[in-house]
């Protein structure tokens, strides 16, 4: 009889645990720049798109942890202690991490800020006006994006690369990708160094293009 109770008890615990697992809220961490960040609704009409994201979900099912930072580049968000380190520390297995950078990586004409600073110092030149946030589109930008991907996966998280918010550079009826770091629909080139494919999205380009066509 005791064995029957034990079997029944274990079965009940398993059932309860499965119910908790089924109803646990999905957590989505979002990292990026000003187009994603939170803003004070009492002082400005500016809004980051991830600031508005929670309203599309039941908070019991999906929780948005928006960590977008105005002025952040892929490099500065990774290196400055208040940002990526505090995000990745709270990423758990099954969490999603939305990654969106590019606009602030285009400093110094597409040159890496640290390289430009080092070159200036070597030649006795002023470093005033050189922005360390800058990355090279084919080098350090990809390096930091890959770091976000690989560190997220190492924690059991699911990285999602989001292309930067589309800028209104129209040439006739077509939007030109002026941004040097705007990889468009080609983020798959990161795959070879990212241990598998990573989902990508370019909906803001498609949306803006559709409005222009109207």
Question: Where in the sequence are the language-model features?
Answer:
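Bacterial N-terminal signal peptides that target proteins for export
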Residues: 1-12
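Alpha-helical cap/lid subdomain in secreted, periplasmic
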Residues: 6, 85-214
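Bacterial N-terminal signal peptides
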Residues: 11-19
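Serine-esterase "nucleophile elbow" of acetyl-processing enzymes
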Residues: 23-69, 84-97, 115-121
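Active-site neighborhood of divalent metal-dependent phosphoester/pyrophosphate hydrolases
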Residues: 33, 69-74, 104-105
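Short, solvent-exposed loop/turn segments at secondary-structure boundaries
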Residues: 40-44, 76-79, 173-174, 199
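Charged, often glycine-rich, active-site loop that binds/positions anionic groups
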Residues: 73-87
């Amino acid at each position: 009889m005791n064995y029957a109770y034990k079997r029944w008890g274990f079965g009940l615990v398993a059932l309860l645990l499965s119910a908790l697992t089924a109803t646990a809220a999905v957590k989505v961490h979002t990292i990026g720049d000003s187009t994603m960040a939170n803003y004070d609704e009492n002082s400005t009409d500016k809004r980051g798109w991830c600031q508005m994201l929670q309203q599309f979900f039941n908070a019991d099912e999906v929780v948005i942890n928006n960590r977008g930072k105005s002025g952040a580049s892929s490099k500065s968000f990774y290196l400055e202690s208040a940002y990526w380190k505090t995000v990745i520390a709270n990423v758990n297995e099954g969490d999603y991490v939305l990654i969106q950078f590019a606009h602030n990586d285009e400093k110094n004409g597409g040159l890496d800020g640290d390289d430009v600073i080092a070159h200036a110092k070597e030649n006795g030149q002023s470093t005033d006006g050189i922005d360390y946030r800058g990355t090279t589109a084919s080098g350090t930008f990809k390096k930091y994006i890959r770091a976000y991907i690989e560190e997220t996966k190492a924690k059991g998280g699911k990285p999602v690369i989001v292309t930067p918010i589309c800028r209104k550079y129209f040439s006739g009826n077509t939007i030109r990708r002026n941004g040097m770091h705007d990889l468009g629909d080609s983020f798959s080139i990161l795959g070879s160094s990212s241990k598998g494919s990573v989902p990508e999205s370019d909906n803001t380009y498609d949306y803006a293009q559709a409005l222009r066509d109207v």
